[in-house]
Amino acid sequence: IDSIRANRDVYMNGEKVKDITKHPMFKPIIDIRAKIYDMQHDAKFKDIMTVENDGEINAIGNSLPFTQEDWWSKRRATDTVMEEVGGVVTRVGDETVGEMWSLYDGQDVLNEVDPQFSKNISNHIYKVLKEDPFHVSANTDPKGDRSLAPQDQDPDMLLHVVKETDQGIVVRGAKYETAAAY
């Protein structure tokens, strides 16, 4: 938790959040995610929450699924988390990991188009296995008020240049949005 407390500029409803780990909008999901990491090291849950790959222990949620049993193991881990936290958690694992697995599965096609991109996918997956980060997907431009035409939106809803200087450009707005609570 300390690692996400430092060096963050997080704003909620226009106000800077002083400590993301204590803010009522972020604390519940941060605490649950910390619990999931703790479960991976707890002797009671370790065999359910982790898997051995090439001699290394990895989070089962990040591990590439190759067999039906791999999928059942992921399901058991998810069920265990739900039982342990006593509720429904919308993000028990990385919601983007499935896309990474799909790209990994499609490497033969990707190699024909861009071998470096294909290699980057493999490198990224193995880095995720080793370091066990928690991705947050932010993969689309903000939608804004969908009842308004694009030209009628808040001008700062989308990323745009507001000033050019000899040193570069100044931008304002958002490039990506996420529905994640963290």
Describe each PLM feature range.
Residues I1-M39:
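N-terminal-proximal low-complexity accessory segments that begin disordered
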Residues A6-V10, M39-A43, K130-F134, D141:
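Intrinsically disordered or highly flexible coil/loop and linker segments, enriched in small
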Residues E15-K22, A43-G55:
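Short secondary-structure junction/hinge motifs that connect adjacent elements
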Residues K35-Y37, A43-K44, V161-E164:
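Glycine-rich loops and low-complexity Gly/Arg-rich segments
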Residues I48-Y182:
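Glycine-rich flavin
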